[in-house]
């Protein structure tokens, strides 16, 4: 019987007297078919190390440990540590780290893998309330994670994988797709969780590009410009740029010049710009002295 089997999950929770904490966004998956699909989507085998975030009682960890070389699972809730020691006792290739992933020194931690030179994949059922900070923290880290296969809120998955000229497209799409390809693999209904969340989830697969999708003079400024363009989605690019950078005649003249260099119409909205468009705009703004 699998940990994710509903009767087994309930028995584990009762045996340990565990109660869910809303502050940790805990929703445990109880569908073994979906867990197998996650492992298949991530293409986990013995030539790969895995980092898992929020293992809960070990439902996904069990599947990962059977397929991966090693699994390092970060769990912030110390009440779950003895439960994981119980449920994962048969595995000698799992390390459970009782730490907030955002505070972990991952560069040091991954040296604890028996073979730290193997490709590392991130496979996780991420808490909804902190999905974006965790993803951006890991993507922007200096660790070359090969890919991410994460279960997140469907709406966030749609935003991350969105293309220009769509309602979901925004600065988050750009921030992730600058580094990674992103595609929704399949939808997970809310009914397969204990307790059931209020929304459906999606499995998002992100694969790191060999290099960023565009070359820019200043990455921080590029991301800043992309955020500025979406501050007021219904406003034109010109309105958002002048609201942020200023409305003096000198500034407006520089903005006009930058848009001209980048060959972008001031009357369009941010959602119409592709990532290469934003790269051209950011570099042009730098060129004119903004």
Curated annotation (Swiss-Prot):
Its function? Specifically dimethylates two adjacent adenosines (A1518 and A1519) in the loop of a conserved hairpin near the 3'-end of 16S rRNA in the 30S particle. May play a critical role in biogenesis of 30S subunits.
Compartment annotation: Cytoplasm
Concerning Pfam families, the annotation shows: RrnaAD
Catalysed reactions listed for this entry: adenosine(1518)/adenosine(1519) in 16S rRNA + 4 S-adenosyl-L-methionine = N(6)-dimethyladenosine(1518)/N(6)-dimethyladenosine(1519) in 16S rRNA + 4 S-adenosyl-L-homocysteine + 4 H(+)
**What's this protein's name?**
Ribosomal RNA small subunit methyltransferase A
Q: Which GO terms describe its cellular component?
A: cytosol
Q: Which gene encodes it?
A: rsmA
> Which coarse location class describes where this protein primarily resides?
cytoplasm
Q: Which family does it belong to?
A: Belongs to the class I-like SAM-binding methyltransferase superfamily. rRNA adenine N(6)-methyltransferase family. RsmA subfamily.
Q: Report the EC number(s), separated by commas if there are several.
A: 2.1.1.182
């Amino acid at each position: 019987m699998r940990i994710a089997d509903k009767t087994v999950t309930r028995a584990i929770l009762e045996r340990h007297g565990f109660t869910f904490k809303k502050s940790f966004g805990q929703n445990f998956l109880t569908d073994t078919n979906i867990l197998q699909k996650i492992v298949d989507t991530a293409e986990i085998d013995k030539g790969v190390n895995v980092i898992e975030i929020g293992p809960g009682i070990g439902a996904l960890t069990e599947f990962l440990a059977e397929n991966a070389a090693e699994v390092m699972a970060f769990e912030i809730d110390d009440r779950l540590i003895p439960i994981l020691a119980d449920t994962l006792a048969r595995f000698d290739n799992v390390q459970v780290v009782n730490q907030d992933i955002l505070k972990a020194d991952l560069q040091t931690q991954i040296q604890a893998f028996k073979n730290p030179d193997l490709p590392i994949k991130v496979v996780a059922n991420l808490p909804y309330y902190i999905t974006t900070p965790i993803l951006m923290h890991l993507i922007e880290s200096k660790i070359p994670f090969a890919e991410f296969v994460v279960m997140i809120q469907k709406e966030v998955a749609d935003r991350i994988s969105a293309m220009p000229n769509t309602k979901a497209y925004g600065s988050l799409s750009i921030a992730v797709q600058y580094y990674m390809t992103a595609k929704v693999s399949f939808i997970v209904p809310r009914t397969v969780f204990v307790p059931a969340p209020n929304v459906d989830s999606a499995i998002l697969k992100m694969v790191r590009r060999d290099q960023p999708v565009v070359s820019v003079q200043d990455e921080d400024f590029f991301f800043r410009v992309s955020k500025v363009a979406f501050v007021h989605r219904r406003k034109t690019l010109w309105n958002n740029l002048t609201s942020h950078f200023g409305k003096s005649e000198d500034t407006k003249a520089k903005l006009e010049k930058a848009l001209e260099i980048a060959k972008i119409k001031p009357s369009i909205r941010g959602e119409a710009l592709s990532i290469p468009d934003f790269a051209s705009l950011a570099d042009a703004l730098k060129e004119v002295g903004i």
